[in-house]
Amino acid sequence: MVTWKMINLGQVSRNQFWGEPDDVVRRPGICNGVVLFDTEQVILVDPPYSNEEMLRCLDAHAGLKPKDIDVVYITHAHSDHFDGIHYFPAARWCTGMEERDILGEMLDARKLDGNKLEGLREKLTPNIQVVPLPGHTMGSTGLLFDGPEGKVLVAGDSVMTREFFEHQKGYFKSESQ
């Protein structure tokens, strides 16, 4: 069984269903960061912050330091989902196979080693399944596992807000990717 903890709450940069135009940033876009505890591995999903806030959230909400993270998993190639990856150079870096090339190029552009990134199709660990969730980006993925409360899906930005789900509308960036 896999247990998990949220380390921060994200926010969308704009929401057309609240009357906010897609071409005006209202607030910084930040994803939810999640830590999974799977037998011998600690997995950080979508490290959201490029600054020391990443370290503070990890410690305050999960009691962890960068050296404690075995795997960093990125759900899709939007920068708010990998801004903090540089804090985890010793960890294994993974994403879904469909995002691997573009995300690798984005890491290279930040002077990080994009070749280190592994593209996965089915399993991250024997207990954690990689699930394709195309929509927000065509290569978006989530992680599905059995938790204490039943089945859990860490889904990145698959559903931005209830309004996006109800209207079956993608985020403004999605249409070009």
Explain the meaning of each model-derived region.
Residues 52-95:
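Active-site metal-binding motif and surrounding structural segment of the metallo-beta-lactamase
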